[in-house]
Amino acid sequence: MKKIILILIFFSSIIKVRAQQDNPSVDTAWEHIYRGSYPRINDLVHTKLAVSFDYNKSWMFGKEWVTLQPHFYDTDSLTLDAKGMEIKEIAVVKGKSKIPLKYSYDDMQLRITLDKTYKSGEKYTVYLDYISKPDELKLKGSAAITEAKGLYFINPKGETNEHTEIWTQGETESNSAWFPTIDKPDQKTTQEISMTVPSKYVTLSNGLLVHQQKNADGTRTDDWKMDLPNSPYLFFMGVGDYVIVKDKYKKMDVDYYVEKEYAPVAKKIFGETPAMIGFFSKILGVPYVWPKYDQIVGREYVSGAMENTTATLHQDGAYQNARQLVDGNAWENDISHELFHHWFGDLVTTESWSNITLNESFANYSEYLWQQFRHGKDAADELNYSDMQGYLMSESDNKDLVRFYYKNKEDLFDAVSYNKGGRILHMLRNYVGDSAFFKSLKEYLTLYKFKPAEAQQLRLAFEDVTGQDLNWYWNQWYYGSGQPSLDINYDYNNGKARVIVDQVQTTGKIFKLPVAIDVYSQGANKKRYKVWLKNKSDTFYFASLQKPSLINVDAYKVLLEIKNDHKSAEEFEQQYQYAPNYLDRREALEYFAKNKLSALANGLNDKFAGLRLFTLENLEKGKGYTIPSVLNLIEQIAVKDPNKKVQAKAIEILAKLNDSKYRSLFEKYVTDSSYSVAGAALEGLAHLEPEQAYTLAKKYSNDALGKLGEVVSGIISKNASENDFNFLLDHFKNEPLSEDKIKSAIAFAQYLLKVKNTENVKKGVDEIMKLRNQIPEQYRGYIDPVFKQLFSKISDAKKAEGNTDLSNYIDGLLK
């Protein structure tokens, strides 16, 4: 989801408005339906599956032995979730015999009458013979997961050049599309899965591969076993032509399942995993409990990644070649996120989807923890700020973190459960302190391991460790909505500095906030005061012999807030120079970008690459690069900065000047190992020497992704003929979902204006439509204006050419 949210933010920056959707009859009935924990009548104990696949029909043939027991009350019936299956047989197992059972089935649930009344603690095993037909199932997904059919056959007949794969996606309740189960997060079961597949393929599932058997028909049966209980939505199967790249954490297997061409770089993509396992085990005080940890990449995957127990599935955006990795591992946060779920989500699981933030806020916050450990506090704080902005831009002020009222459980996978939840944990860590924070997490994980939990149990763990009543915090942040909007003013009179903080949010709610305030007297000298905001307006006085050079409210920079801070230019200069945190410096640079471009240049020498990049971006927007002293610094960055993205942005700015003195610089860096740097350099050449740039674009087109891919696509599209269609189509198709692909779509659509071949135009607009359809339905109101504009231009051009049928075809795409 995080990837999708960033792309949506990019789209919103293009269109500047949020599309208004016609919705004359709004369904509000759900607002009165309480969604609590699910009644537990029967408990899963063990699930055994034997499956094989029909690749031509995209079917799975399944046999299941599911062992259960009544949760507490005696029962003579069993309800299993089983979506869109053909049921052939249901029986209760008695020794070596099977006794048929009566049942009813509505294509969603099996209601089974058992052979007798079973008492609490009395186990029984039900046998089911069935066929799963996922492609005949129609269910909606969520923002995080765009489909919900559970079992996916990718290129099953080998009709395209794509890899043939099978993979599953269970969350929220989609695994019951390929095996009958009680598909609720509060259920836990051990498991065995036997997969019979063509012998040329490898398989992956939860737990350990305990046996393999070659069969006479050219297939092989792999037996996977998981002895530790986990929830049904975490079950996984993966099948395909993968290379298994071996790694280790201590003596435990840590393997990476990738396509052959990515085997040489698999450890560069996933190789931090063993260190992450060690780091998370240490800070939590709870070792990684599972028997191994594997990661696999799936083509056409419907989410970003999924924490299937011991078998995490990543979308193909995880695939990066050596040149992409020069710019940094774009998938590192996703790797840490899914791994951390093996404590928060897999080991201790949300009791109900209403409490999904217990899984997702922790996984989100793990990204901060890892960034802080591996890349430093500035990098972590930059991520924290980015995630906070992602939440604030989602316009979710009315949503509680724990939501017992919702229309669809899929709607809970949003910027509140993830981003806001992570920020709430960050504030909690700051409030109680590191020692108490991690000790509380250890207690929570220890008390509820292999069990479901809800947010109150997390609170009780924190209260037990800290000795404090934290109901106020949970009520405000977990069971409340919104965030404070602070208006901060300062004055000084008669030896006293005064700070006035007004809470100006329009919800009428007043937040209780512990806040640190630093008062600076001279240079870096400061005194820290800890205060509470708890009124609509709070005023604080600090004795000071002279007017403070800076007063820094929220000195730790941890508050989830919207802020209007009325500092002067001189105070922001002091803040940039002496306040230590990433956000201190960023706030100052933001002020300079709007009010004092000459001071903004200070950010070009910042120790942190992210702020150097931020400075360059704002100098570009404000044309501050035209100041001679600033331009001199940018020229130095273009050749010396150790960070490739910063260097690339500097070259991009030089390209805007159309100055021939930079030609040699562009020619030098157009062959750089970084796609970002090479792309920026090629863009510069395109301004100075269009013919040379076109020749180079054609030359480099077979190895052009990211920024270089965007520039190559733009240059060739601008100059392309009808004969270049297949190249441009393939180039566009092969770009991973990203901001660069969206920019390429605009260039590709421009090219289609001059394509005359009807079938080629259809192929092109269909491919653009595929990109649009990768965005979840509920967010398309943000982006459809962009696609409509692209399609409208192409349609008008074809109508002008007299191709009315093609024009009508294009017009129908977004109706």
Identify the function of each model-found stretch.
Residues 6-10:
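Sec-dependent N-terminal signal peptides
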Residues 780-815:
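Eukaryotic acidic, Ser/Thr-rich intrinsically disordered low-complexity regions
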